[in-house]
Amino acid sequence: AAEAGVRVIWKPFLLGPIFSEQGWTDSPFNLYPARGRYLWLDLQRETRRLGIAWRRPARFPFNSTLATKTATWIDTGFRLPAYCRAVFRAGFAERRDPATPTVIEECLRQAGLDRAPLDRALAEGGGERTRADVAAARQRDIFGAPSFVVNGELFWGNERLGAALERAWVD
């Protein structure tokens, strides 16, 4: 996106509440075994193609509530994407649990941040902000991640990033 001159506004949100509204009690990748097997194979292929370190997490999905609540206290500038990448690296490359304050603090440090967002998430909860982000995702008909919204049009899945960028160029 940066190479294409497209500005991205990161909006972390929780998928769990959106899945629950669809009647799912777990990730669809656990509920539907064939879909799950495909996901893990596809993640292996994509991360290899992109040169991203990846190992299947010991537990999936991991609880991302604390990571997401912490994200609500980070400015949407360049540090938020760095923090999100650090959280994903911890969970999907290093097999560390991003539900723990210790791991979140390390992710903040890797993004060049102090632990203030974590402290605010722990003290003030961040629940209202997190619920607002889920509501905003719901309003945009977002049902999975990653999702990209360009001028109100939804693109879902990493393989749709190119189409989303093309749409941004046209508009």
Walk through the language-model features, giving the residues of each.
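Structural alpha/beta surface segment adjacent to cysteine/selenocysteine redox centers
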Residues: 1-94
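C-terminal cap of thioredoxin/glutaredoxin-like
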Residues: 1-7, 11, 86-171
